[in-house]
From Swiss-Prot:
Residues 1-57 are annotated as: Disordered. Disulfide bonds: none annotated. The lineage of its organism: Bacteria, Bacillati, Bacillota, Bacilli, Lactobacillales. GO terms for biological process: translation. It comes from the Bacteria. This is Small ribosomal subunit protein uS12. It comes from Streptococcus sanguinis (strain SK36). Pfam families: Ribosom_S12_S23. GO terms for cellular component: small ribosomal subunit. Keywords: Methylation, Ribonucleoprotein, Ribosomal protein, RNA-binding, rRNA-binding, tRNA-binding. Part of the 30S ribosomal subunit. Contacts proteins S8 and S17. May interact with IF1 in the 30S initiation complex. Belongs to the universal ribosomal protein uS12 family. With S4 and S5 plays an important role in translational accuracy. Interacts with and stabilizes bases of the 16S rRNA that are involved in tRNA selection in the A site and with the mRNA backbone. Located at the interface of the 30S and 50S subunits, it traverses the body of the 30S subunit contacting proteins on the other side and probably holding the rRNA structure together. The combined cluster of proteins S8, S12 and S17 appears to hold together the shoulder and platform of the 30S subunit. The modification 3-methylthioaspartic acid is found at residue 102.
Length: 137
């Protein structure tokens, strides 16, 4: 336990919270070619590679992912949620934060139904999460 005098000389430091989606906290000034500290809830990017990867143990599947070059020139791996997708190389996608627990290194999700990404077809429940329009009654 420190004395009052020790605390006066050297106060306690507050913990610095590390971001779980650091690529969303960086902007880019293309005129000056410098990165800036601009936080944003989503970012636009171009898919450079689309493929599948296998999850960690004990799960088994082929999870769809895309390697995306963001508008701030950072390249990240993002998960494509839902059943089926229309993404290919050079598709323009919208990214949000949110990791996939059983895929190491995947910290971002692609937003379905935005930009070049189509919503999930034939989806009746939880449509807003997958960019599906309301079906005609």
């Amino acid at each position: 336990m420190p004395t009052i005098n020790q605390l006066v000389r050297k106060p306690r430091k507050s913990k610095v919270e590390k971001s779980k989606s650091p690529a969303l906290n960086v902007g880019y000034n293309s005129h000056k070619k410098v990165q800036t500290n601009v936080s944003s809830p989503q970012k636009r990017g171009v898919a450079t590679r689309v493929g599948t990867m296998t999850p960690k143990k004990p799960n088994s599947a082929l999870r769809k992912f895309a390697r995306v070059r963001l508008s701030n020139l950072i390249e990240v791996t993002a998960y494509i949620p839902g059943i089926g997708h229309n993404l290919q190389e050079h598709s323009v996608v919208l990214l949000r934060g949110g990791r996939v627990k059983d895929l190491p290194g995947v910290r971002y999700h692609i937003v379905r139904g935005a930009l070049d990404t189509a919503g999930v077809t034939d989806r009746k429940q939880g449509r807003s999460k997958y960019g599906t329009k309301k079906p005609k009654a």
